[in-house]
Amino acid sequence: MGKVADRYFEVHPWKIVEQGFNPAYSEVAESVFSLGNEYTGIRGYFEEGYSGKSLQGCYMNGLYESRDVPRSAYKGMLEITDFMVNTVDWVYSRITCNGVVLDLAKCEISDFVREIDFRTGLLSRRFRWKVDEKTEFALTFERFTSMEEEQYCGQKLSVQVLSGQAELYVRAGLDFTRPHVNQGKCMFTMDSKSIDGNTCEITATTGRSRQTLYAAAAFKGMEGTAWETGEAIAANEYRAVLAAGERASLERVVTLICARNEWEHASFADR
């Protein structure tokens, strides 16, 4: 029996568009909506977390980890292999409204649109979230990786209350706890982190290849406080109380700096 292809995404001259969210295509969509600038790349997963099927991944060109290969009975076979490793989740966000956590696998949403614009390099996603019988939100997420200054990335969250009144909490920062799926664990050990309500930074190193990644984020748009956790997460928490028609936004600019070789390690502090 012959195979028949179905067209899930809309294709435009400069855009790929997803109209409506189908969980069956979640991981495929994450691949299609990936961003990269040859220095770093990030899959198109949901910033706010998602309890359905997902493969979160953010990668740095040339940043790898090593592992042993099961010994072969034949000569000349590899005993050690290197692989590009999942690094920091620099779009890490957790959103709560009136005590309800945003999770597209569980929440009632409508008017979902996600698109990537190849002319501008911008990935955007928007939808309406019905929090409860009285409260409804419109949310827009945007992100990009810089082509001019490859160490820089950006993300923006915009919200508008369509009805009701909302007490909104946004936890945003840098998450170095994400596992490398093939290994089933995070391949980094945290070296240091700091948070102050407006910025956060974290540094971590791979266990075997001894490669280091420094990530820092600066935020603006909402009042923030440091969010303390014992995990390898550097994040702040932002709060806004909004009535119907009111808007709020939170922007972040992220810097990612690698130490992958002898020269980069020697100049790491200066960079």
Feature map (PLM): residue ranges:
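Beta-sandwich/jelly-roll carbohydrate-recognition scaffolds of carbohydrate-active enzymes
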Residues: 2-271
